[in-house]
C-alpha cells in the first residue's frame, strides 16, 4: 500500500463502527501485510500477518499448481513439546528466541494428510513469505528451484537454479520448479533445528511414474 503507515491509521477501528479504505495496487509482486496496532511485535508474533500477490497487468504464465506458505514463530512460556495451553512469553519475544517455528500458523503444517500434492511433470509455483520476526533459509530437500523471484519482485528477471534462499522478516519470494521424480519432498527452514525440532516443515507429495533417467538406485 502506497500511503502513510500502509493504511494503518485508516483501519484502526474503535467502538464507533467499521472503517474501510481504498488503495490502488500499482506494483506487481508478492507482499507481506501485518497488524499495526500496539503492541505490534506481539500481534505479529501471534499470527496477525499474511500475503498479498499483485499480478502484472498481463497476468501470470500458467502453471499446474500454486501454493502459499507463510513462516512465523511462536513464543511460549512453556518448553518445546510441553502439553496444554501455552501462554505467550514477551521475554522470549524480546530476546528473539522463539519456542516454535510454523508454516501457515502451525508446527508441522502441510504434512501427512495436510501435505500439498503434485504430479510428475507438474510446474509448481510457490509464494513464500515470512510474516513474523526471524528470517528464513528456505530450501526444498531433493529439489532445485528453477526460477527464484527474489524479494517477491515480479518485475525483475528471476535467478535460475537455486538451492537455498534467504527470506527476510517481513519479506517474500516466488519460486517455480518442475517436479521430475515421484516421492516426498520436504520444505524447510534450513537452519534445521527450526525444521526438525521446532516445526518449520512442510511436505510436497509427488505422484506419478518413476523416472530412472533422472533418479534411480544402483
Predicted features and spans:
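Copper-binding active sites and cupredoxin-like electron-transfer domains
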Residues: 1-218
Amino acid at each position: 500500500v502506497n500511503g502513510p503507515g500502509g493504511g494503518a491509521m485508516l483501519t484502526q477501528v474503535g467502538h464507533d463502527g467499521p472503517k474501510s479504505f481504498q488503495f490502488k495496487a500499482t506494483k506487481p509482486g508478492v507482499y507481506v501485510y501485518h497488524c499495526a496496532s500496539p503492541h505490534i511485535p506481539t500481534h505479529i508474533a501471534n499470527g496477525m500477518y499474511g500475503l498479498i500477490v499483485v499480478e502484472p497487468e498481463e497476468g501470470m504464465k500458467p502453471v499446474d499448481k500454486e501454493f502459499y506458505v507463510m513462516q512465523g514463530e511462536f513464543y511460549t512460556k512453556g518448553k518445546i513439546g510441553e502439553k496444554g495451553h501455552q501462554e505467550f512469553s514477551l521475554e522470549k519475544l524480546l530476546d528473539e528466541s522463539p519456542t516454535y517455528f510454523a508454516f501457515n500458523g502451525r508446527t508441522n503444517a502441510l504434512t501427512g494428510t495436510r501435505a500439498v500434492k503434485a504430479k510428475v511433470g507438474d510446474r509448481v509455483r510457490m509464494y513464500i513469505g515470512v510474516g513474523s520476526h526471524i528470517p528464513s533459509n528456505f530450501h526444498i530437500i531433493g529439489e532445485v528451484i528453477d526460477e527464484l523471484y527474489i524479494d517477491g519482485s515480479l518485475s525483475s528477471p528471476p535467478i535460475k537454479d537455486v538451492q537455498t534462499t534467504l527470506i527476510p522478516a517481513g519479506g517474500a519470494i516466488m519460486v517455480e520448479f518442475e517436479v521430475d521424480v515421484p516421492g516426498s519432498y520436504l520444505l524447510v527452514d534450513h537452519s534445521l533445528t527450526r525444521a526438525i525440532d521446532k516445526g518449520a516443515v512442510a511436505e510436497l507429495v509427488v505422484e506419478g511414474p518413476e523416472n530412472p533417467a533422472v533418479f534411480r538406485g544402483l
